[in-house]
UniProtKB/Swiss-Prot annotation:
One Pfam family hit: CLP_protease
Stored CDD domains: S14_ClpP_2 (cd07017)
Gene from which this protein is expressed: CLPP5
Name under which the protein is recorded: ATP-dependent Clp protease proteolytic subunit 5, chloroplastic
Source organism of the structure: Arabidopsis thaliana
Lineage: Eukaryota, Viridiplantae, Streptophyta, Embryophyta, Tracheophyta
UniProt family annotation: Belongs to the peptidase S14 family.
Length: 298
């Protein structure tokens, strides 16, 4: 007779599917036999890991945001076959990287652009990321628009850039000098190379930095290829940009041209306090809330 629990009878026992039955022969013992309606949990987990190990590379990557990088999130099996292959993919807000499946979802892009638009209504623009033609075109358009809307109110430009194209940076610089409103510049994070040049190009008395920012100046970088004449042309062009940038830096900082030439011969890093002493900026903002409004002259 079958029972739903283990019997303590002296008769021999036979293991069936979750039931215990008495053996028809009480004098001998049958070998235990286990019959389950499904595989044990350990076997199912092992089979699942083997299946995941075969299929995880074929799964569609999902992009997740990490700092300034968009990292495709590839499902990876856990356990003895755990493999993680992280690929750092740089992205730029000026290019719809989501179209290639490696950028933020459209909703994230819309929210980001919405925040930028809200700041723009308060005459706050950003110079963030590498300085290239696309960034320059956007900033130039923003400066011209704000000049047309109200030429009497200051414009605040936040700089967090490692530098970039000299010609693109000069387009922004010339527009800053061309428009009527004062342009207050604020360094947030890093202003290096062309980023530092644009930071120093703000209206004198209205150039600021947050306390933990870093600022770096150096000479233009580039390369050339082709015949000797081609290389000479490119070398002369680099010398022109170097002399032009150093001349403006000397004017913006009050340093002598000889000192600027010497300091920019190699990467010259400064803290916010050192940049103020050097003349690149006019003050260090210890209270970040003050930077949310157009800044008065020091």
């Amino acid at each position: 007779m079958a029972h739903a629990c283990v019997s303590t009878s002296a008769s021999s026992l036979r293991f069936t599917a979750g039931f215990v039955s008495a053996s028809p022969n009480g004098s001998s013992f049958d070998s235990p036999k286990l019959s389950l309606p499904f595989e044990p949990l350990r076997s199912r987990k092992t089979n699942k890991l083997v299946s995941d190990r075969k299929n995880w590379k074929n799964s569609t990557p999902k992009a997740v945001y990490s700092g300034n990088l968009w990292t495709p999130e590839i499902p990876s099996p856990q356990g003895v076959w755990s493999i993680r292959d992280d690929l750092q993919v740089p992205s730029s807000p000026y290019f719809p990287a989501y179209a290639q499946g490696q950028g933020p979802p459209p909703m994230v892009q819309e929210r980001f652009q919405s925040i930028i638009s809200q700041l723009f209504q308060y005459r706050i623009i950003r110079c963030g990321g590498a300085v290239d033609d696309d960034m320059a075109n956007i900033i130039v358009a923003q400066l011209l628009y704000l000049d047309a809307v109200d030429p009497t109110k200051d414009i605040v430009m936040y700089v967090n850039s490692p530098g970039g194209s000299v010609t693109a940076g000069m387009a922004i610089f010339d527009t800053m000098r061309h428009i009527r409103p004062d342009v207050s510049t604020v360094c947030v994070g890093l202003a290096a190379s062309m980023g530092a040049f644009l930071l120093s190009a703000g209206t004198k008395g209205k150039r600021y930095s947050l306390p933990n920012s870093r600022i770096m100046i150096h000479q233009p970088l580039g390369g050339a290829q082709g015949g000797q004449t081609d290389i000479d042309i490119q070398a002369n062009e680099m010398l022109h940009h170097k002399a032009n940038l150093n001349g403006y830096l000397a004017y913006h900082t009050g340093q002598s041209l000889e000192k600027i030439n010497q300091d920019t011969d190699r990467d010259f890093f400064m803290s916010a306090k050192e940049a103020k002493e050097y003349g690149l900026i006019d003050g260090v903002i210890m209270n970040p809330l003050k930077a949310l409004q157009p800044l008065a002259a020091a």
